[in-house]
Regions:
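ATP-binding/phosphotransfer module of carbohydrate and carboxylate kinases, centering on a glycine-rich
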Residues: 1-61, 79, 83, 99-109, ...
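Phosphate-binding/catalytic loop of phosphoryl-transfer enzymes
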Residues: 69-163
């Protein structure tokens, strides 16, 4: 049996395949090796397993984690091994999951547009080039957190239209000082800003919000995608909630910058199931 884990920034999704057929799917808590202990991860995986699922039947585990670097692969591998001792365990960053889900074993360009941003060139087996998105503070252009951060800055500085201000006031129960306190002193400021991606999406008919989303995608191209050599020769393939739900704004920007639209997926799991069925 194969077990695939797509561990995003908040909730990992697990899917078990037996002879290519989906046996079960379940969710667990988010895992950032920088902030959790080994015991916590082991206990949480065990707690998340369905009652009728026997971990001893798992032969291979493919764990793709957001923010998981090579330095942390051993930590994740050890945690999973304590729950599934007979399994061969593969650990990689979520960017490889996105490339495999979007492109399978074909070369091309792949991007993630969700709470954060990432992108790469992929040769059908491995990532060959990754222009660093630099994370929430320095970059992540085009992401939900980037849009939310810009909206909050404009709101606090009074640079939004009256119509947009009324919408924001109805959904953001904080003044400027409180927003600053949350961003600089509370955990996960990226998630705090990213939650307002839905507000922006739901109000795209208001020019301020549409222009904000459009410019965020333009900055994605200006600051990241245009740095890939000969980027216009690739199709734009993307996975993530922002890329999926903002398609009507994203597609014209992609075409304006000379790329053609390829595959757009809300989550990578469906593509990962396809990919690992061929193993």
């Amino acid at each position: 049996m194969i077990l695939i884990a797509d561990s995003g920034a908040t909730t990992p999704t697990w899917c078990a395949l037996d002879r290519g057929a989906v046996v079960t799917q379940f969710e667990s808590e988010g895992y950032n090796p920088n902030y959790i202990t080994l015991d916590y991860m082991v206990a949480d995986i065990r707690k998340a397993l369905p009652a009728d699922f026997d971990p001893r039947t798992v032969d291979h585990v493919y764990f793709y984690g957001a923010g998981v670097t090579e330095l942390q692969y051993g930590f994740v591998r050890e945690a999973i091994a304590q729950v599934m001792p007979d399994a061969e365990i593969f650990v990689a960053m979520d960017l490889l999951a996105s490339a495999r889900a979007l492109l399978g074993r074909k070369p091309g360009f792949a991007a993630i547009l969700g709470t954060g941003t990432n992108s790469c060139l992929y040769d059908g087996e491995r990532i060959t080039l990754n222009i660093d998105s630099l994370g929430f503070i320095l970059g992540d252009e085009g992401s939900g957190a980037y849009m939310g951060k810009r909206m909050l800055v404009d709101y606090v500085r009074g640079r939004v239209s009256d119509e947009a201000r009324r919408v924001i006031e109805a959904s953001v129960p904080y003044n400027g000082d409180e927003i600053i306190d949350i961003i600089y002193t509370k955990p996960f400021p990226n998630r705090f800003c990213g939650q307002y991606g839905k507000l922006i999406h739901d109000n795209l008919a208001i020019p301020y919000f549409h222009d904000l989303a459009e410019d965020s995608f333009c900055q994605l191209f200006e600051q990241i995608i245009s740095l890939y050599p000969d980027y216009r020769s690739y199709a734009f393939n993307c996975v993530g909630s922002v890329g999926w739900y903002f398609q009507d704004v994203l597609r014209p920007v992609v075409e304006r910058y000379g790329m053609r639209i390829g595959n757009l997926l809300r989550t990578p799991m469906e593509g990962l199931i396809r990919y690992h069925r061929e193993d």
